Amino acid sequence: WGGAVMWRGTTRAKPIRTGASFVGLGTHHHRVVFYPISQPDADGLATINWIAEITMDNSAGWGNGDWNKKVAIDHFIHHFEGWNYDWIDIPGMLRGADAVYEYPMIDRDPVPSWVDWHVALLGDAAHAMYPTGSNGASQAIVDARVLGAAMVSKGVNGEALQLYNGTLCEPISAVVLRNRG
């Protein structure tokens, strides 16, 4: 655990600027990211996905076994009080969520191989990583496509699994390490 904790939620609100804008505010250690994930309704409100993140002292480790826990807004809102701008009220947006989930950013060291005999890992099982590039789900899709293409090319066998492993394991392990910051 590197000390980063994210809180995620969705809030019904008016989207800003183009209505499809992705906004990131803050620093690498204290930030908020938000963007709409729906079209505005008749009242002009869209579902806004948001992520609030801080990095704290990690010397004691993460003291909670949960990594996807529902929490009260008061648990973390104090980190974002005063983040009011003429075009967005960050504390108001965070408070507007029906549910908020806490995610300590925990990754795993890369493994030397994603394949063991006739078993292959893909997605987070192969390469759990910080969502620095917001690419976790996308990478799992890439894994599945590369694995599928290897099976089309080589058949459903160990040779296909080795092709998949040889294509992705080393370069994606490097991404895991880069995403640590």
Feature map (PLM): residue ranges:
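Conserved FAD-binding catalytic core of PHBH/FMO-like flavoproteins
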Residues: 1-87
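A generic structural signal for residues located within well-ordered alpha-helices
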Residues: 2, 117, 139-142
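Short, conserved beta-strand edge motifs with alternating hydrophobic and charged residues
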Residues: 35, 49-53, 93, 102, ...
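Acidic/histidine metal-binding catalytic segments
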Residues: 81-99, 157-162
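FAD-binding beta-loop-beta segment adjacent to the flavin cofactor pocket
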Residues: 102-130
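C-terminal helical "tail/cap" subdomain of flavin- and related membrane-associated enzymes
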Residues: 112, 132-135, 149-181
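A conserved FAD-binding loop/helix module that cradles the flavin
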Residues: 131-143
